[in-house]
A protein has these predicted regions:
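Short, acidic, Ser/Thr-enriched surface-loop or helix-capping motifs
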Residues: 227, 321-322
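A structural motif corresponding to the C-terminal lobe/cap of the Radical SAM core domain
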Residues: 227, 231, 246-273, 308-309, ...
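Cysteine-cluster motifs in flexible loop/terminal segments that predominantly coordinate metals
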Residues: 364-410
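Short, small/polar residue-rich loop motifs at catalytic or cofactor-binding pockets
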Residues: 312-316
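Radical SAM/AdoMet-radical enzyme domain recognition
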Residues: 95-116, 122-253
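Conserved alpha-helical substructure of the radical SAM core
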Residues: 2-13, 17, 31-164
């Protein structure tokens, strides 16, 4: 599977909240320090089209779009959201359909496009897609497993102005990683691909999907990423969709989930990498709880990008487009809200009932609806949908009890 932001391998899920970045506007410091689109002076969703769209509709324009440009993949990862496999998939968007959709999207915004999969490097016209996104004012980045990166491909990335790729490493050793990824030798190939990309000046983000199988190895994978000289390290909390449904018993219990996020809060203080959890909206609650206990204010100067964004961005500033054109709030949110072959993305983004409900925090139910942190957390709507069948239900993997439910004043 590639890398994620709306999905860990498409999220900067890559799904990149998919970061390459789950971030809002006006936050340049960390991006400039660690490389990536913002270091090139690019401000997603900050152009005239986005400003005009927001003034007209009252809806934020999307700033990050994770786009599964193919589902074909050379690996068969145990946790894959897409359940991707090698070989052609019927109905994938053509180059002309992709261009038409880009034209529509840039009429309302200038986002980061996370080109993911599957393995996007298996798509023969990827550089035409990359160039078209650049020409239209967007910023393309790539979520890849890095096993196909050669000097020739890395040179193409540099020539076509790819500022960053995201790559998943789930274990610190080849035996464990290869078993999880379903391909002997892929650990060594991934590490080699990262090195090649770096030699050609392409920024690299390492993603790690955290399960019960590797939760005790997060520090080791972080240290490996540091040794490899990458720019960023993001941990992704498993959302059981796609092939990941087979890992339901490997998802961290809520208490361990919380412990990993608390560890991440402490570790990011000293990490030389841009380090953050993804698919973990609780982290933004934890930041504020810890900051209060430490007598700090959550400011951009103190916390960088983490002070400027919220947990779940699906439908708010982030969207996912599948290989066949289905539009979803993120790659894990298993519900089609429209298809770009039948309806422009801009209309789906504006008119979808689900998108508009996700933007209204007052509709959240249970603990999430009562929580004083709902504006900065919001719970994982994909996880709520997967576990309960209701995307507005309370986050099923959160241990926090809101102050109002404890009979206390809100913080």
């Amino acid at each position: 599977m590639a890398d994620s932001v709306g999905n860990p391998d498409a999220r900067p899920d890559l799904e990149l909240e998919e970061e390459f970045g789950s971030e809002d506007e006006g936050t340049l410091t960390e991006r400039q320090r660690h490389g990536g689109a913002r270091s090139m002076g690019f401000r997603p969703g900050g152009g005239e089209a986005a400003q005009a769209y927001e003034a007209k509709t009252g809806i934020k324009a999307p700033r990050i779009i994770a786009w599964e440009i193919t589902r074909s993949c050379n690996l068969s990862c145990a946790h894959c959201r897409a359940a991707a496999e090698f070989g052609a998939y019927a109905g994938e968007l053509s180059l002309e359909q992709i261009k038409a959709t880009v034209d529509d999207i840039v009429s309302i915004t200038n986002p980061i496009f996370i080109l993911t999969g599957g393995e996007p490097l298996m798509r023969p016209d990827i550089w035409e897609i990359v160039d078209y996104v650049h020409d239209k004012g967007g910023m393309p980045v790539i979520g890849t497993n890095a096993t196909l990166i050669t000097d020739e491909i890395a040179a193409q990335m540099a020539a076509h102005r790819i500022p960053r790729i995201s790559v998943s490493i789930d274990f610190p050793t080849a035996v464990e990683h290869d078993g999880f990824r379903g391909q002997p030798g892929c650990f060594d190939a991934t590490v080699e691909g990262i090195g090649i990309a770096k030699r050609h000046g392409v920024g690299v983000q390492v993603n790690m999907t955290v399960t019960t199988m590797n939760a005790d190895k997060v520090e080791e994978v972080h240290d490996l990423a540091e040794q490899l000289g990458v720019d960023a390290f993001h941990i992704f909390m498993l959302v059981p969709t796609g092939r990941g449904e087979d890992l339901l018993d490997k998802e961290l219990p809520p208490e361990e989930y919380e412990a990993v996020l608390e560890w991440a809060y402490e570790r990011q203080k000293t990490s030389p990498l841009h380090f953050k959890p993804t698919d973990a909206p609780h982290y933004y609650r934890i930041i504020r709880q810890k900051a209060k206990a430490e007598g700090k204010k959550v400011t951009r100067e103190e916390y960088g990008l983490d002070a400027m964004t919220r947990g779940c961005l699906g439908g708010i500033t982030f969207a996912f487009i599948s290989h066949v054109g289905d539009v979803q709030p993120c790659g894990y949110f298993d519900m089609q809200l429209g298809n770009v072959k039948e309806q422009p993305f801009s209309e789906i983004w504006t008119e979808s009932r689900v998108f508009n409900e996700l933007r209204d925090y007052s509709l959240l139910k249970g603990k999430c609806g009562a929580c004083e942190y709902k504006a900065v957390c919001g719970g994982c709507r994909a996880r709520a949908l997967s576990v309960t069948g209701d995307y507005l239900a309370e986050e099923p993997y959160c241990v926090y009890v809101p102050a109002s439910m404890r009979g206390e004043c809100e913080e």
